[in-house]
A protein has these predicted regions:
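Acidic/His- and Gly-rich active-site-bordering loop/insert found
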Residues: 2-118, 135-141, 149
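Acidic/histidine-rich catalytic neighborhood of metal-dependent amide-processing enzymes
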Residues: 117, 121-162
C-alpha cells in the first residue's frame, strides 16, 4: 500500500472514526475514587466492540477482581512479518472546573471537538482502530493491542494484563 493509498483509506474512514470517538468520549469512564466503576466497564465494552468491527479476530476484556478492565486484541502476523504492540487507555481524570460545556457531551468548535478524555487518550484508541480500518482489517504485520482502564490511577494492574 502506497502512502497515497493509505491516506485515501484514512480519509475514507475519517467521519466514522470521528463519530466513534465522540461516542467513546461521551462515556464518563472516570478512573478515580468516588466514581462509578461501571462507566469504565461500559467504556471497555465499547472499545472491545470497536476493535472487533475493525477486524481483530481475538478481542478480550481483561481484569482481575477489583481492577478497571483492560481490552486486549490481536491480529496474527502474516508469514515472516513482525508483530507490533500498540497501547492506549480508555479511562479519564475527573472533569474538574472550568468547562464551557458539559465535559462528557462532545462539542465541535472552530473545527475541533472538545470533551473530557478526547485527547488523553480516547483519540489514541481510535487511532489504532483507524489504522486497522485503513488496512481493510488485514494489516501487513501482526498487531497486538492493549487498552487499559487504569492509566489515570497509576496503571495498577497493567503488569498483570501483560
Amino acid at each position: 500500500m502506497t502512502h497515497q493509498h493509505l491516506k485515501e483509506a484514512v480519509d475514507s474512514h475519517f467521519e466514522t472514526i470521528q463519530s466513534e470517538l465522540e461516542h467513546l468520549a461521551a462515556i464518563p469512564s472516570v478512573s478515580a475514587a468516588g466514581f462509578d466503576p461501571e462507566s469504565v466497564r461500559e467504556s471497555a465494552e465499547y472499545v472491545a466492540n470497536l476493535l472487533r468491527k475493525a477486524g481483530f479476530p481475538d478481542v478480550r476484556i481483561l481484569g482481575p477482581p477489583g481492577a478497571h478492565p483492560a481490552v486486549y486484541a490481536s491480529y496474527p502476523a502474516p508469514e515472516g512479518a513482525p508483530t507490533v504492540l500498540l497501547y492506549a487507555h480508555h479511562d479519564v481524570q475527573p472533569a474538574g472546573e472550568g468547562w464551557n460545556s458539559p465535559p462528557f457531551e462532545p462539542i465541535e468548535r472552530n473545527g475541533r471537538v472538545y470533551a473530557r478524555g478526547i485527547a488523553d487518550d480516547k483519540s489514541g484508541v481510535l487511532m489504532h482502530v483507524g489504522a486497522m480500518l485503513a488496512h481493510g482489517g488485514t494489516p501487513p504485520v501482526g498487531v497486538k493491542v492493549i487498552i487499559e482502564g487504569e492509566e489515570e490511577i497509576g496503571s495498577l494492574h497493567l503488569e498483570d494484563f501483560l
